[in-house]
Each structure stands twice: as C-alpha cells, then as structure tokens.
Amino acid sequence: MTGRPDKRAIASWALYDFANTIFSMNVISLYFALWVTVDHGGQDILYSLALSGSMLAVAVSVPVFGVVSDQTGRRRLPLTLLTIISVIATALIGQTNQLWVGLFLFIIANYCYQSALVFYNSMLPDIAKHSNVGMISGYGVSLGY
C-alpha cells in the first residue's frame, strides 16, 4: 500500500471481521449444534461430522485459493461470491425442518465462510501500510469482540 490509508477500506475490513465473529461464535460454536441436537433430536456426532467434513474440504481447497489470490490479485469477487453463498446457505438452514438438509446447508455455509477468509486476509496488505497492519487488523478484532 502506498499513500494514506483509505478509511472506508479500513472500516469495511473491520465490519467484515465483526460479521466473521458473529458467524463463528453464533452459528458454528453455539446455535447450529443446538439446532441439530435440541431442535431436531440429532446426535452430537452429526454436527461434528458436518463440521469436520466442511473443514476437510477447506483444507484441500484453500491452498489453491491462496495461489489464485496471490497470482491473479483477484480477491474482491471471490470474497463477495463466497460470502453471499455462505449467507444464503445460513439463512436457508432456518427455513428447513429436515435435519439432513440443514446439515448439508451448514457444510456449504461453513465451507464458503472459511474459504472466504483466504481472500479477506490477503486484502489486508492492500489497505494497510506494513507499519500499521497490526493496528488495522486489531480494529477488526476489537470490533468483532
């Protein structure tokens, strides 16, 4: 990055981090596990398998996304598409009463959420000088918590 930091870009960075925290804390850590076990009478293992399956897919694919991000410099479009898919899949979980459909939607939502982070994190050097990367990253963390 050269010149003055773009305040709008920094604010966008921080707000995205805020949304990440909401998704991670509420959907992944708290509510979806309860949705599976309490609302639908599923076993804990189903939640664990869905989470593990989505993370396995992430582990296989995000190195490729990282290469694409680094070599092409295209970050905004993949970030936007993955975020939109994650939001839609998350919203649809609340619209279904079928456990297996909800588990499938959760896998999609979490996969896209985790994959989007590759593009989101790679944008930080574009909005921050090397000397203030930590501070700007901290804005996002502090807003999220």
Task: For the regions a language model picked out, list residue spans one by one.
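Hydrophobic core of transmembrane alpha-helices in multi-pass small-molecule transporters
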Residues: 89-90, 97-119
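Helix-loop boundary and gating motifs at the non-cytosolic
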Residues: 2-55, 99
